[in-house]
Amino acid sequence: MGEEVQMSDYDVSGDGDRVSEWEMGLPSDEDLASLSYSLIPPNLAMAFSITPERSRTIQDVNRASETTLSSLRGGSSGPNTSSSNNNVEEEDRVGSSSPGSDSKKQKTSNGDGDDGGGVDPDSAMAAEEGDSGTEDLSGKTLKRPRLVWTPQLHKRFVDVVAHLGIKNAVPKTIMQLMNVEGLTRENVASHLQKYRLYLKRMQGLTNEGPSASDKLFSSTPVPPQSFQDIGGGGGSSGNVGVPIPGAYGTQQMMQMPVYAHHMGMQGYHHQNHNHDPYHQNHRHHHGAGGNGAFESNPYMMQQNKFGSMASYPSVGGGSANEN
């Protein structure tokens, strides 16, 4: 090869195959420090417990020089082979000293590195670490502080639900109107569902037993319109709902509309005896215990001095014109 170093091109002296041109520009023996000279003084080495290295002799230097020259001469004939051998030896030394090196060697040998199908162990480990780091980060971001429903917070919730109506209240709107920092839509949705079940249990519409949230719910009185909304079947049948429980004055609210019927409607019954649809079906509904005619008669709504029929539910049959 043209790049190979030919030893015959240089002037070689007879003293140990020394090349004089290689020594040009190098310091002389007088300029160099003695091999027996220690860079660390003995007192300093003793103070810091430094073990002095063995001093080198001229024989050691000659031996190292001969080893270097022989490696250069051997490398000129096959530089690629020697470099590959050195790399393999270095890899073997590193692999034998590190744990798990057998699996890495197996992956490297299976890849062959020619067609790019091999997998670099370092890159694979870095990718695994990156994935685990991403999972840990996502797990931290998903953790949220648990919200505790206090009586004050529940009272605010009840006020908002009463304002919207239990049927029309949705978690998103409730959350916006409550305007509480840290309150999420999931918190409101879960609390709203428990609150509706609580209202149904209070009205006897479900057979479910008491829950752990009943103590919190009982801390704030339930607005009457919430009972009306949750109990009303709605619609054209005229069934407004079931009566409000005794804790909120059932007997008084049921007597007030009946008293308004006998007192406020007495003159109207005599004047419109033949044309009053309510009078024609009065016996039927009175015998059935129904008060649905109060809703179908707008004149009666005006004569009701107590104003209770528009805000509280009634019990019993359907519309006055049902038959």
Swiss-Prot record:
Q: Where does the UniProt annotation locate this protein?
A: Nucleus
- DNA-binding region(s): which residue ranges? 139-200
GO biological process terms held by the UniProt record? circadian rhythm; negative regulation of transcription by RNA polymerase II; positive regulation of circadian rhythm; regulation of circadian rhythm
Q: Does the keyword Cell cycle apply?
A: no
Which residues does the annotated region (Disordered) include?
Answer: 1-25, 53-139, 267-298
Supply the induction statement: Circadian oscillation with peaks at subjective dusk.
Give the matching Gene3D superfamilies: Homeodomain-like
One GO cellular component assignment for this chain's record is: nucleus
Q: What happens when the gene is disrupted?
A: Mutant plant flowering lacks a photoperiodic response.
Q: Name one GO molecular function term.
A: DNA binding
List, alphabetically, the Pfam families matched. Myb_DNA-binding
Q: Which portions of the chain have biased composition (kind: Low complexity)?
A: 65-87
Alphabetized, the UniProt keywords read: Biological rhythms, DNA-binding, Nucleus, Transcription, Transcription regulation
Q: How does it assemble?
A: Interacts with ELF3 and forms a complex with ELF3 and ELF4.
Q: What does this protein do?
A: Transcription factor that is essential for the generation of the circadian clock oscillation. Is necessary for activation of CCA1 and LHY expression. Is coregulated with TOC1 and seems to be repressed by CCA1 and LHY by direct binding of these proteins to the evening element in the LUX promoter. Directly regulates the expression of PRR9, a major component of the morning transcriptional feedback circuit, by binding specific sites on PRR9 promoter. Binds to its own promoter, inducing a negative auto-regulatory feedback loop within the core clock.
Record protein name field: Transcription factor LUX
Question: Which organism is this entry from?
Answer: Arabidopsis thaliana (Mouse-ear cress)
